[in-house]
Amino acid sequence: MELQEAIALIKTDGLNTKDKQTWADLGCGQGLFTYALAGLLAKGSTIYAIDENSSALKKINSTGNVIIKTLHSDFINDDLDLVNLDGILMANSLHYVKDKPAFIKKVRSYLKPESTFLVVEYDTDKPVATWVPYPAGFQSLKKIFSEAGYSTIKKLHEHSSIFNSGNIYSAIITR
């Protein structure tokens, strides 16, 4: 996927693009969606790009408008020193989380009360051992976040995927 495709996948009117924001990209990899989010946020915003792959993090740099701070950490098991985030982006990383309800409860402590989740995932519930061990198709995602107290779980866009001839979807989630 190219940067412009990633931007189109997460672009939404539900995202505050006028005010400075602080976000975390959990499981950011080499930063494709970190850069996509940076392209949408207001100048002066900050994104914490978090991944356990230190080699991938070395490829991520700040953009002209948005500060990107990399953090080498296991976002699933480590307690992150993050507070008052405006949002969390999880692009192709939620499917590595086995206990999603417990994880959502944990990361909620990183967020402001009026915050946003942006999720990009494969629209399947069928696991693939190494790459998608704990999938969350959109209907499953709705159920998980609804049970965690979130009221708005909206599918934004879809993009074809080479994985299993299916689709990747994006969703915005708010309380």
Each PLM stretch: what is its role?
Residues 1-21, 36:
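Conserved alpha-helix/loop element of class I SAM-dependent methyltransferases that forms part
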Residues 86-100:
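A short SAM/SAH-binding and catalytic strip from SAM-dependent methyltransferases
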